[in-house]
Regions:
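Bacterial lipoprotein signal-peptidase II cleavage site
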Residues: 18-24
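C-terminal motif of bacterial Sec signal peptides marking the signal peptidase cleavage site
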Residues: 14-16
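Short, linear, compositionally biased motifs with a strong N-terminal bias
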Residues: 10-11
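Basic, polyanion-binding surface patches
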Residues: 24-225
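Sec-dependent signal peptide recognition
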Residues: 2-7
Length: 225
């Protein structure tokens, strides 16, 4: 995955170096890149926000300089390696905090915490340093990294900062902990009990993850026979 990202960055750089003023002119670009209609479909153009929907609603928690817990919502996040996650972030109170503490936790918003999670995305810790308490949430200091765990989120990843550059945060997952309320009878995490929400960029709304519709690496076996 890292090699692919690096290759894409190099190709993008080479492409930008090879353009001239004529190509960079928006009028010329529109003429050269006129989109063709796809039969039976509606074109939306290069609207990548819709392409990647639905997106996870991850809650990033950090300590500020006064040891106040801060949490924000992010949607551009995913798996980066076996024990690493990647999150795309602009500058926030959260990024200021993790630059100092070199740690953060990631939890997952769920049906029960929609309002509070949305609030954390609306209000900056720069303006409301006690926003976690105002939402009625409580914290437990992580025993493994220098960051708070938000008790009201049943599933949490405790992470150390691997790198933070050009808006890309890479974190190493040190531990994942789950509340008993989202475990099945065998002690495994049950997303059906967690009921995580996702961000629907097309509708500008949150949706709940639904029921199991098929078994991974199993549902398609009928076509291999």
């Amino acid at each position: 995955m890292k090699r692919i990202l690096t290759l894409m960055a190099v190709l993008s750089l080479l492409a930008s170096c090879g353009t001239d003023k004529k190509t960079n002119n928006p009028e010329n670009m529109n003429k050269n890149e006129a989109l063709q209609e796809v039969a039976g479909r509606k074109n939306f153009g290069p609207n990548h926000a819709l392409v990647t929907t639905p997106q996870p609603c991850v809650m990033i928690a950090t300590w500020d300089e006064n040891k106040n817990p801060d949490v924000m919502m992010a949607a551009w996040a995913g798996q980066y390696d076996a024990r690493q996650i990647v999150i795309s972030l602009s500058k926030h109170k959260t990024t200021d905090n993790l630059e100092k503490t070199k740690a953060f936790t990631v939890s997952f918003a769920d049906e029960r915490t929609v309002a509070e999670s949305d609030y954390f995305g609306l209000v900056s810790g720069n303006n409301v340093p006690n926003k976690v308490a105002r939402a009625g949430f409580t914290i437990t200091p992580s025993p493994n990294v220098n960051a708070p765990i938000i008790n009201e989120y049943p599933l949490t990843l405790e992470c150390k900062v691997v790198s933070w550059s050009d808006g890309i945060l890479v974190g190493e997952v040190v531990n994942m902990s789950a509340d008993d309320c989202i475990l099945d009878d065998d002690g495994h995490i049950d997303l059906g009990k967690l009921k995580p929400i996702v961000f629907d960029a097309a509708a500008m709304a949150y949706r709940s993850v639904g029921e199991i519709v098929g078994k991974a690496w199993g549902a398609g076996k009928a076509f291999t026979e």
